[in-house]
Amino acid sequence: MRLRGCGPRAAPASSAGASDARLLAPPGRNPFVHELRLSALQKAQVALMTLTLFPVRLLVAAAMMLLAWPLALVASLGSAEKEPEQPPALWRKVVDFLLKAIMRTMWFAGGFHRVAVKGRQALPTEAAILTLAPHSSYFDAIPVTMTMSSIVMKAESRDIPIWGTLIQYIRPVFVSRSDQDSRRKTVEEIKRRAQSNGKWPQIMIFPEGTCTNRTCLITFKPGAFIPGAPVQPVVLRYPNKLDTITWTWQGPGALEILWLTLCQFHNQVEIEFLPVYSPSEEEKRNPALYASNVRRVMAEALGVSVTDYTFEDCQLALAEGQLRLPADTCLLEFARLVRGLGLKPEKLEKDLDRYSERARMKGGEKIGIAEFAASLEVPVSDLLEDMFSLFDESGSGEVDLRECVVALSVVCRPARTLDTIQLAFKMYGAQEDGSVGEGDLSCILKTALGVAELTVTDLFRAIDQEEKGKITFADFHRFAEMYPAFAEEYLYPDQTHFESCAETSPAPIPNGFCADFSPENSDAGRKPVRKKLD
């Protein structure tokens, strides 16, 4: 598989009109990956700061948290559901001022000496909801502490010592995983607050639902837009030359990010409040359209592209299996196109055997775009042509249907590596014994990983102990059982772009601190993906 540049249908954010139904092509970089490379001088600076300023900054930040805790504790006593009094009591204003000052001191101690603010924050009566993007780090809490706005948080967050008390002070909206109706109740609560005519604090929401590397804006979750109330878009920038801020699924862990950031002399952050966006009647009826149009406005302000990658694509990259998807895999793009064509993974998984039998009957015979569309039972379209081009590496106008079936298998069941390999062996294997040669194994694994180049010679020789020049799935399965980490040793031992993004931490926590509450994302059967702590 090969991703040709940014795709034939790439477009800047400004051209993505409200009624534009095309899916924009993805950016050149995977938004869920962040590589941090320090020069020799930067490493020397980190070493010096680690021994000098870092411990001081850490102690001051911790002291500020401890100082804020009793104030927040006293101020948050009572029912959080009770409507705030209007106008706020004098003591509440004093506590607000003190907490903002303490939090600002904490960020100052961390190197955020100046927070540049552009534009004007809307009044609660003008916009009850603030949508922030791009969401790239836990340092995105800076605008929350500066404004003392409410946020949407997991219910479990209230039990975190000190931090949980500070959170409760800002009257957050909690989402409970144990309550099946929690997401619906959350949307109703946001709608209730939005219609309170400014009686409740504004709610800050990160509609991307996860952290990215700020190279683009991924699909916005519709939860913040379901109430149909006006929102104020807020864009965040961290213009430091060395980006120690970004906390993505693949890259430095949370503790490493904290350490490197506190070892910088100065950390820059910019917060820009854009004009309030009032939805049209059509947008009120269609939250996805509302979210898309707000995202377009924010992308234009940031000067970045938009992509229809979603948090679910990140879950695909993080699925636990014996083959780890590389950072530059084409399968994220393939999964996006599958969604765009309206193909449901649940239905595709049931039809995989039928697809594979159809591909096996072709026996490697190449097919054109029309037959490709007929095989997937979808009409020819721009999206299908984009998918077709992923497999048409030579530009001949023909592809091998078997490769598409392998890619579909990975997207439908990303954690079941051996099931995908077994399906591939059925399609590629010789009729008499189901064996494949080195060339076919290379094609299978390249497609399963979504890469254009891959050397499998060492792996093939290790499996083919008898030097028959061919292997069966039984041989492959036996080898995989004996050497579960065969991919790291034989396929990409020295290739840094294959670095795993699915490391397990002893105390895993979600990526980002703003919980998702979109109703359509409530699959209770799927195990939630966790971000590595370090």
Curated annotation (Swiss-Prot):
The chain crosses the membrane at residues 58-78. Keywords: Acyltransferase, Calcium, Cell membrane, Endoplasmic reticulum, Golgi apparatus, Lipid biosynthesis, Lipid droplet, Lipid metabolism, Membrane, Metal-binding, Phospholipid biosynthesis, Phospholipid metabolism, Repeat, Signal-anchor, Transferase, Transmembrane, Transmembrane helix. This is Lysophosphatidylcholine acyltransferase 1. CDD domains: LPLAT_LPCAT1-like. It is a single-pass type II membrane protein. GO terms for cellular component: azurophil granule membrane; endoplasmic reticulum; endoplasmic reticulum membrane; Golgi apparatus; Golgi membrane; lipid droplet; membrane; plasma membrane. Its main location: endoplasmic reticulum. The HXXXXD motif is essential for acyltransferase activity and may constitute the binding site for the phosphate moiety of the glycerol-3-phosphocholine. It catalyses: a 1-acyl-sn-glycero-3-phosphocholine + an acyl-CoA = a 1,2-diacyl-sn-glycero-3-phosphocholine + CoA; a 1-acyl-sn-glycero-3-phosphate + an acyl-CoA = a 1,2-diacyl-sn-glycero-3-phosphate + CoA; a 1-O-alkyl-sn-glycero-3-phosphocholine + acetyl-CoA = a 1-O-alkyl-2-acetyl-sn-glycero-3-phosphocholine + CoA; a 1-O-(1Z-alkenyl)-sn-glycero-3-phosphocholine + an acyl-CoA = a 1-O-(1Z-alkenyl)-2-acyl-sn-glycero-3-phosphocholine + CoA. Optimum pH is 5.5 and 7.5. It comes from Homo sapiens (Human). Exhibits acyltransferase activity. Exhibits acetyltransferase activity. Activity is calcium-independent. Catalyzes the conversion of lysophosphatidylcholine (1-acyl-sn-glycero-3-phosphocholine or LPC) into phosphatidylcholine (1,2-diacyl-sn-glycero-3-phosphocholine or PC). Catalyzes the conversion 1-acyl-sn-glycerol-3-phosphate (lysophosphatidic acid or LPA) into 1,2-diacyl-sn-glycerol-3-phosphate (phosphatidic acid or PA) by incorporating an acyl moiety at the sn-2 position of the glycerol backbone. Ca(2+) binds at residues 392, 394, 396, 398, 403. Erythrocytes. Residues 7-22 have a biased composition (Low complexity). Pathway: Lipid metabolism; phospholipid metabolism. It is found in: Endoplasmic reticulum membrane; Golgi apparatus membrane; Cell membrane; Lipid droplet. Residues 1-57 are cytoplasmic. One of its GO terms (biological process) is phosphatidylcholine acyl-chain remodeling.
